[in-house]
Swiss-Prot record:
Subunit structure: Homodimer.
PROSITE patterns, per the entry: AA_TRNA_LIGASE_II
Protein name, as recorded: Glycine--tRNA ligase
SUPFAM superfamilies reported in the protein's UniProt record: Class II aaRS ABD-related, Class II aaRS and biotin synthetases
Residues spanning the signal sequence: none
Record organism: Staphylococcus aureus (strain NCTC 8325 / PS 47)
Gene Ontology CC, one term: cytoplasm
PANTHER family in the cross-refs: DNA POLYMERASE SUBUNIT GAMMA-2, MITOCHONDRIAL (PTHR10745:SF8), GLYCYL-TRNA SYNTHETASE/DNA POLYMERASE SUBUNIT GAMMA-2 (PTHR10745)
Amino acid sequence: MAKDMDTIVSLAKHRGFVFPGSDIYGGLSNTWDYGPLGVELKNNVKKAWWQKFITQSPFNVGIDAAILMNPKVWEASGHLNNFNDPMIDNKDSKIRYRADKLIEDYMQDVKGDENFIADGLSFEQMKKIIDDEGIVCPVSKTANWTEIRQFNLMFKTFQGVTEDSTNEIFLRPETAQGIFVNYKNVQRSMRKKLPFGIGQIGKSFRNEITPGNFIFRTREFEQMELEFFCKPGEEIEWQNYWKTFASDWLTSLNMSSENMRLRDHDEDELSHYSNATTDIEYKFPFGWGELWGIASRTDFDLRKHAEHSGEDFRYHDPETNEKYIPYCIEPSLGADRVTLAFLCDAYDEEGVEGSKDARTVLHFHPALAPYKAAILPLSKKLSGEAIKIFEQLSSKFSIDFDESQSIGKRYRRQDEIGTPYCVTFDFDSLEDNQVTVRDRDSMEQVRMPISELEAFLTEKTKF
């Protein structure tokens, strides 16, 4: 079925996945709060990433670095001078746009070219396209543009009681630098030999000019990043390894391979630190968007931090007796983006035999579903016994307890939030200690002893 972004956003708000930020005060543009179901979904996504990329990996360990860092970190990394977006203003609407995204949206929506990439174009090239194509402001419908200029994306604040340049610090625009500055600490304390990786999940902040598309692009976002260090010359081999590993992680969580594609960056599109980058993109209802960037960052970051800090980041290879600065492969995934992708991918509207109304269902992998099961007493008279099952299972799983409205409406409600199993406690359950377990996707029902529920859910929800 063709999926509509407005419908998915409406469901997310209605069912408690995502709410507009600061809603009672009119909101704040492109800020979102995760509701009770959204925080469970996102936490499950992060847990699944950590499980496969850190806990079960023979190579990798994790850290949690500070958001606020010494400003010299950003000077060394190049963010103070180079972390900019091309900005253009419409003089009539007074609205500011990212020039590259303005062009890409036009090429996709008007020209039908979903593969056009403006990244890597010079200011002059972008302005020429805007002028030649007659691209207009979506609000004012005029082409009365300023020149394109640089706009630094870092949020600036001050540490201490005085607001002067000596106390100027920044909210981190990426989690990666916290890993690089801790490279020696981790390598020595954990006695790691190459190749090895350091992973992190954490918030980052970018003062994006044109954030949008729900939680796809926001100024405050969460990243799941791995910096994988290897011997120079082996970086492309390891980049290919992590491309496959990342793709397999997505499909193992039921993401449709038909909605995914790998796109290699052209040479003129590569970041200044990269010699090879591949994006895993997902086909959202609004078009293709980057989920995962898998970049070979060479030795750029460690080399720059060595130059600015005076630290020696060379690795002594015990096998060859060489000393060299390791190369780095970075699989960087946006937690909010991939959560949105799983939400879009899971959404479906299905016809139901014997009913004129379609059912809305979220086909989440059970490991990602906010609730693994819902306990449904057939009558409120049975709630006292049914709640005992909830108490038994909720110590191991996220479980819902729902006793209001008809059993059919409760089934539909659980389908709509992606609960894989509904457990109905009826009057026969009082006698035979069995319950009816309904499968979300097939809608098939089986009778099962209450004593077997924990083992059943453990098997069905494992990842």
